């Protein structure tokens, strides 16, 4: 806790509520209420928007390290003023911190878990030391490298709600020693456990029976798993490490894991929220991971094996909670077993769905044919160019040898290149909305830079993370609603055409994009505002400037709050039906029905109701409007290249959509932009072909007919009904186009 605490008083907040109207999108308030509004037990309801923003801003501003001592009145006054400006910015929905910050900032959970403010992480799958971390197995020295460590890091961060990118490239996997032992695993449970019968069905055995048959065995490792996140991680670490001589010096090969203390299915999880899965998914995971490693005795684990272990962990984390586990596996570009691993449909449906898979390349790579073929069939692999990430900030600023030399991978959505153990740290501004709300964009982006800088002063649980964060202090200031903003301010899209050119290295003909000069000037000016803000704040705090500063995040759920296009992506359609799914007991449903929204039972999930909300994109009727269904694959690549060149010194998250007749352009375009785009992924455009599709394009008349049926304001109706409930979330919502990121 800081010695001095900055707070926002009620008089100020009441004044802002009187002066500013939040720019809610059509889906905005409902999405907020079911995703980011925390339960207030003393008021027997969830937060209102002003209460959420107050919590979030106070949680952030008090991370300023000067408050740990006795700061001057000048510092207190300036930080109070900054907190007020941030409150205005976020309350108006001109900008928001990441969904993770909206959910966690200012809570007791944040104070206990410094990691909790960062959305996503990256870890290299190779033996590493645990170091001075909150989780260290008792059977090894904290400085000793262990095969289990990166898997423990991934398991821990996933359970704290973060996404994790992980690298299984050859250089990492080759460092894992050969598997020395098969492990004979037993999982036991006490008859008194509420999970007893269900656990026996998935392979556990009666504890008393096991003890009767195995008394006096001294070659057994017995571990009673505590009902904690750390307990789950340590049990899995013990299982993995017993297979290797370096971490099993006694060469004991029988392991007994006692799950009797683990809370049953449906019990509440305090802190992050959600409900417990019971021990059953954990039991299945233990046996599955043990089988993967046992099959490699006398050999080394492969990239596919390591990815399977990570996927099995991810599957377990998902099992009992609405929130999704987000993983990105990064493999070597010539590892065909890795590239094709999802073609095994049985394993895909069992656990390999748990990660999006990408390959690491450099700018000399030219074998895009097999990659394009995979993309056409299942949308994978994505591409991550580590050479560009290590040696470039913005492409416009040219080659800077080793400017980010520790980079080994990326977060699951690909917008931040990361070193081992490093997290992304995000905040986004909606320039189209901010201008409408009267903001000077440079001030808005400067506030964003300072917000993210403070997050780097959190207390981090893992030593590997603390070290790299203190070195890099990487921030990710993003902009979203980019298509809305550029079309509004320029009158047209930023790519104004293409001209014939030749590839300087190969001589091949290419179509070089032409960018609006004013568009370049707009984003360049904002980039330099972020750099200046970070430099000034770093000097105030006496720390290094951030190694990189800007990005474009995919921004699915957060963009819905303000009703803008998602990140750099084009609106899915000018007019569409957005379907969102609610638990059938949700008290928001009567309010939605009363206001005229169409609801129907979900055809995929029991006890779930599908609500249809008609949406109109900003500028849908403009002759220069383009949607994901009409914009060309070439223009999407060119737009991503524009942002990577002039705005983002990290990377740009983009899922390029393509029509069937454009698939032959994938490989040539990937090659054309090999010196510009740091990471990208592609998916076929499906339109509304699936039943109860999340997004279904419609025409203007259908939209107007739907809107005419809607009467009343859901927020007002819901508040008048006064039937709020605790612990409800939207069902199976997606935070980005690729589905790679956690919800919050």
Swiss-Prot record:
The active site is at residues 413, 415. Disulfide bonds join 120-424. It is an enzyme of class 1 (oxidoreductase). It catalyses: a 2'-deoxyribonucleoside 5'-triphosphate + [thioredoxin]-disulfide + H2O = a ribonucleoside 5'-triphosphate + [thioredoxin]-dithiol. One of its GO terms (biological process) is DNA replication. Its cofactor is adenosylcob(III)alamin. Allosterically regulated by ATP and dNTP. One of its GO terms (molecular function) is cobalamin binding. Its EC number is 1.17.4.2. The keyword Transmembrane helix does not apply. Keywords: Allosteric enzyme, Cobalamin, Cobalt, Disulfide bond, DNA replication, Oxidoreductase, Redox-active center. Residues 690-729 are annotated as: Adenosylcobalamin-binding-2. Signal peptide: none annotated. Residues 570-631 are annotated as: Adenosylcobalamin-binding-1. Residues 148-159 are annotated as: Effector region-1. The keyword Endoplasmic reticulum does not apply. Residues 169-318 are annotated as: Effector region-2. NCBIfam families: RTPR (TIGR02505). Monomer. Belongs to the class II ribonucleoside-triphosphate reductase family. This is Adenosylcobalamin-dependent ribonucleoside-triphosphate reductase. It comes from Lactobacillus helveticus (strain DPC 4571). The lineage of its organism: Bacteria, Bacillati, Bacillota, Bacilli, Lactobacillales. The gene is rtpR.
């Amino acid at each position: 806790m800081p010695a001095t605490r900055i707070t926002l008083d009620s008089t100020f907040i009441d004044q802002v509520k009187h002066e500013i109207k939040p720019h809610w999108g059509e889906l905005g308030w409902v999405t907020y209420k079911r995703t980011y509004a925390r339960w207030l037990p003393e008021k027997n309801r969830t937060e209102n928007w002003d209460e959420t923003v107050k919590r979030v801003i106070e949680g952030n501003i008090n991370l300023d390290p000067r408050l740990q001592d006795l700061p001057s009145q000048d510092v207190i006054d300036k930080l109070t003023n900054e907190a007020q400006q941030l409150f205005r910015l976020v309350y108006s929905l001109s900008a928001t911190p990441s969904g993770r910050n909206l959910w966690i900032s200012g809570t007791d959970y944040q104070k206990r878990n410094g990691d909790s403010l960062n959305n996503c992480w990256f870890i290299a799958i190779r033996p590493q030391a645990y170091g001075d971390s909150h989780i260290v197995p008792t059977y090894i020295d904290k400085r000793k490298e262990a095969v289990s460590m990166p898997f423990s890091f991934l398991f821990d961060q996933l359970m704290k709600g973060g996404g994790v990118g992980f690298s299984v490239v050859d250089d990492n996997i080759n460092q894992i020693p050969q598997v020395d032992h098969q492990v004979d695993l037993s999982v036991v449970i006490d008859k008194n456990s509420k999970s007893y019968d269900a656990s026996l069905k998935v392979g556990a055995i009666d504890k008393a029976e096991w003890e009767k048959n195995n008394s006096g065995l001294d070659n057994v490792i017995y571990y009673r798993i505590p009902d904690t996140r750390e307990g789950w991680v340590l049990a899995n670490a013990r299982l993995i490490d017993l297979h290797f001589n370096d971490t099993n010096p006694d060469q004991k090969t029988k392991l007994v894991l006692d799950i009797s203390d683990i809370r049953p299915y449906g019990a509440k999880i305090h802190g992050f929220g959600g409900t417990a899965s019971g021990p059953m998914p954990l039991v299945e995971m233990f046996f599955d991971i043990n089988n993967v490693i046992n099959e490699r005795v006398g050999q080394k684990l492969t990239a596919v094996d390591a990815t399977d272990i990570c996927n099995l962990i991810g599957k377990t984390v998902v099992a009992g909670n609405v929130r999704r586990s987000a993983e990105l596996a990064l493999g070597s570009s010539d590892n065909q077993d890795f590239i094709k691993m999802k073609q095994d449909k049985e394993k895909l449906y069992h656990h390999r769905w748990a990660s999006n898979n990408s390959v690491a390349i450099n700018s000399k790579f030219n074998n895009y044919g097999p990659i394009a073929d995979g993309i056409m069939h299942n949308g994978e692999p994505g591409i991550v160019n580590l050479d560009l990430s290590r040696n470039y900030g913005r492409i416009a600023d040219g080659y800077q040898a080793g400017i980010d030399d520790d980079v080994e991978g990326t977060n699951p959505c690909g917008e931040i290149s990361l070193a081992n153990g490093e997290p992304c740290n995000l905040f986004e501004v909606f320039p189209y909305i901010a201008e409408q709300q009267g903001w000077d964009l440079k001030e808005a982006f400067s506030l964003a830079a300072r917000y993210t800088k403070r997050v780097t002063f959190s207390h981090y649980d893992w030593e590997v993370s603390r070290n790299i964060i203190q070195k890099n202090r990487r921030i990710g200031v993003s902009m979203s609603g980019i298509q809305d903003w550029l079309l509004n301010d320029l009158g047209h899209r930023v790519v104004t055409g293409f001209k014939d050119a030749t590839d300087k290295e190969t001589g091949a003909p290419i179509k070089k994009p032409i960018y609006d000069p004013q568009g370049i000037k707009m984003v360049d000016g904002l980039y330099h505002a972020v750099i200046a803000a970070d430099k000034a704040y770093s000097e105030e705090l006496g720390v290094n400037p951030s190694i990189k500063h800007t990005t474009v995040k995919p921004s699915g759920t957060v963009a819905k709050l303000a009703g803008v296009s998602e990140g750099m992506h084009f609106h899915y359609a000018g007019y569409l039906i957005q379907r969102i799914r609610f638990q059938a007991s949700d008290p928001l449903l009567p309010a939605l029905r009363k206001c005229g929204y169409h609801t129907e039972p979900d055809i995929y999930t029991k006890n779930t109701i599908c609500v249809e909300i008609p949406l109109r994109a900003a500028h849908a009727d403009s002759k220069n409007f383009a949607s994901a269904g009409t914009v060309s694959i070439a223009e999407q690549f060119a737009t991503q290249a524009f942002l990577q060149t002039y705005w983002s010194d990290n990377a740009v998250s983009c899922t390029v959509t393509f029509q069937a007749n454009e698939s032959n352009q994938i490989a040539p375009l990937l090659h054309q932009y090999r010196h510009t785009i740091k990471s990208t992924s592609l998916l076929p455009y499906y339109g509304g072909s699936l039943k109860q599709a999340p997004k279904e394009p419609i025409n203007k008349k259908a939209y107007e007919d739907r809107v005419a049926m809607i009467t009343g304001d859901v927020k007002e109706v819901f508040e008048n009904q006064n039937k709020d409930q605790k612990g409800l979330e939207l069902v199976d919502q997606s935070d980005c186009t690729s589905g790679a990121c956690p919800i919050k």
